[in-house]
């Protein structure tokens, strides 16, 4: 019989928003819990989620994850969840206030970076406070990435 701790998935990344780091300049990151139903957790454990087009929004005293897609759990019949429903994010009051100030006054955006399971087996969302990049900034990032690839190729051959 396996030890109890080995059955858990430690920091298993379920979904990652890879375009976020290209489209936004990441200022700060936060770890937030997600309020999920049972079938949503089971769907996440299967590794099925998409947060590519999702974003977070503040409404009142709460922060919500909007437009994230968690597909229905196939073994659940009539008690399934809606795949694109809004999900409440669990943050400290102090963190929520700090994020609201940054969004409203400084014109920043809340972008989800990845969904993963922590050591305790709880689903967490890595949320980034970000500023949108302009087109020339994106081109500059792409040029820098290409130059780094060329440098690594030259170092391997020479």
From Swiss-Prot:
UniProt xrefs under InterPro entries:
SmpB, SsrA-bd_prot, SsrA-bd_prot_CS
Q: What is its main location?
A: cytoplasm
Q: Which Pfam families match?
A: SmpB
Question: Does the keyword field hold RNA-binding?
Answer: yes
Locations listed in the record? Cytoplasm
GO CC annotations, alphabetized = cytosol
Top-rank taxon = Bacteria
Q: Is the keyword Cytoplasm in the record?
A: yes
**By its UniProt entry, which SUPFAM superfamilies does this protein fall under?**
Small protein B (SmpB) (SSF74982)
- According to the record, the residues making up region (Disordered) are 134-158
Alphabetical keyword list: Cytoplasm, RNA-binding
Q: Which PROSITE patterns does this entry report, sorted A to Z?
A: SSRP (PS01317)
In which residue ranges is the amino acid composition biased (Basic and acidic residues)? 137-149
Which sequence ranges form a coiled-coil region, renumbered to this chain? none
Q: Which cysteines are joined by disulfide bonds?
A: none
PANTHER family referenced in this protein's UniProt entry, alphabetically: SSRA-BINDING PROTEIN (PTHR30308:SF2), TMRNA-BINDING COMPONENT OF TRANS-TRANSLATION TAGGING COMPLEX (PTHR30308)
Query: What does this protein's UniProt record list under function?
Result: Required for rescue of stalled ribosomes mediated by trans-translation. Binds to transfer-messenger RNA (tmRNA), required for stable association of tmRNA with ribosomes. tmRNA and SmpB together mimic tRNA shape, replacing the anticodon stem-loop with SmpB. tmRNA is encoded by the ssrA gene; the 2 termini fold to resemble tRNA(Ala) and it encodes a 'tag peptide', a short internal open reading frame. During trans-translation Ala-aminoacylated tmRNA acts like a tRNA, entering the A-site of stalled ribosomes, displacing the stalled mRNA.
Query: What does the similarity note say?
Result: Belongs to the SmpB family.
For this entry, the protein name equals: SsrA-binding protein
